[in-house]
Amino acid sequence: MEPAAPSCNMIMIADQASVNAHGRHLDENRVYPSDKVPAHVANKILESGTETVRCDLTLEDMLGDYEYDDPTEEEKILMDRIADHVGNDNSDMAIKHAAGPEMNIDIVTAAASMSGITTASHSALPIRRPNTPDFRRHSEKKAKKHKNKQRQRLDDVVAKLHKPSESEADEDFIFQQPQEEEYQEEQEPQVISSSPQHFDERSPSRSSSDHGGHSGGNSRDGQFYLSSGSEDEDDEDDERVDSGYRGSSRSEDSSRYRPHGGSHSSRSSIKSSGSGSSRHHHKRKAVPERHHPFTPPSAKRYAAAAPSSRYECPVRVDSSDSDDAPTMVQRGTLKIKSFRPPSSGSNSNKHSSSSGGSTSSSHKKQQQQQAPSKKPVMSSGSDKIRDMVDRTAGGYVAPNAHKKCREDKSRKYPARALEYKNLPFRPQSPQYLLGKAIQFCKEETVHDKFIMLFYTRSQDVRKAVDETRARMGMRPNLSISCPFMTEHTKPINHSRETIDRTSAACTAGTQAVWDMEERRGQKCVPRTSDYRSMIIQAANPPDFLGAVKTCLHLSQVFPKQVCMRLCSITGGLNPLPIYEETVSSYVNAQFEADDISHHEDESGEYESDCE
């Protein structure tokens, strides 16, 4: 073997420095260890014999990022001997296994072990992984799967921690409706134990809202704005706030919260109009606030982040049962109730949290309870009339049913609403309407007059009507109806016999008209028109003129979509007795004689200011 370069850090050929270092004669034909090699390794190499070792690479080159050929048989034998010599403890067992021929280890590992470089732990060197798109995609998928698994374990632990016992679940979530006597017996000890200040803060507001009474000079105004149904409205608002957490608003008809219902079809509007029926309210037991396992995580985080148990939020209030009820957003202070599981129908009282159910099964039960009911809801509108016609007249017959399908006699074809892009009648001029309104105000006959407002259901007209209703709502002494639809029956031309019989009965008098026979000759159900109507009635002339001008401004903006008419009521009175006092006060102030003064002239005669 040729002598290696002197720069070799691991093994070098004998030279003068090596001779002086080892203190003996060295053979130039042999390979000896360098001074940088540990002593026990150098002695082992010297005692091993005449076997040669590769020394063409430095230690830095061996530990660098290079690929090496497989070691030779002589190198494997030498590495095995070194491993047997230093492999007494457990830390060198990995070196012995790595030096074996079955592991196909390269010379770098052998050189590191010979130079005394050993790791503190038993772990192997880091494995180089390929940097390919497929491998990165596989790694991301594996990491995401592991993260989801850890999150699922955490959710299970949280669900077990928050899951109440069976007795607590029955106590909290089975809502009973006790009688008033039971409720009073339960509330009496609470009132006695509570402080007077705490009792004065809550009890007067509840009693005053129930009975509509207020102390002081504003008692009459309070009676007007507070009715006996205020308690029901408050509870309905609280339930709507809770429905936002438990997601029960999906099962309700969304057209109820729109100011003009759903589609143009008569059936859709009829079904939506029947969804707002009033519910009877009973006082519930006071239950402690508790997070239910069915509560969604978003609701738990929101409740935990809330600074107090009271907060301000916009509350949606429906003031009527129809689908055209005026929708208002009112800011108020509501109390957060405890979260309740979603309920549907009559199964709400039977729902209780199961102690052994898993999270997946409880989620499925929650989705089943939130699903809307498939049972048809009978409204109090045209559906009842349709059923009555089916029972009495022998079945509903659409006007053009014979054109659609002659053979299928059992099918009932629905009649769509009479749709009009523009109003089907010609409106009157604003000058004529304003002149008539002034004439009514001169005659002091406003109490038996009212305004009829008709408009189509286009989007821009509907928004303008809502703004007009809001402006009129700020005026006093007005009675404004909710927008409503009109039903129309089938037009039929009367025969000559019917005309003569009616004329003879009217000539004979009231008894003849009362005894006159009526002949019904049609079986069709009334059809609704898609345009809406409103009635506005005022108590005094200033309020009547203000409402007339507001409606005239709207009709001038939409001359073909909005129409206003003035109507008279035979023997009309105020819609509510609360306006009687303001009408009397207006009349008395107009014809009051206290301000009329009399002046005496020089001749001794009296002269009035009215002359």
From Swiss-Prot:
It is found in: Host nucleus. Keywords: Activator, Early protein, G1/S host cell cycle checkpoint dysregulation by virus, Host nucleus, Host-virus interaction, Modulation of host cell cycle by virus, Phosphoprotein, Transcription, Transcription regulation. Pfam families: Herpes_IE2_3 (PF03361). InterPro entries: Herpes_IE2_3. Residues 119-155, 180-383 are annotated as: Disordered. Strong transcriptional activator of the E1 promoter, shows an autoregulatory function by repression of the IE1/IE3 promoter. The IE1 protein has some additive effect on the trans-activating properties of the IE3 protein. This is Immediate-early protein 3. It comes from Murid herpesvirus 1 (strain Smith) (MuHV-1). The gene is IE1.
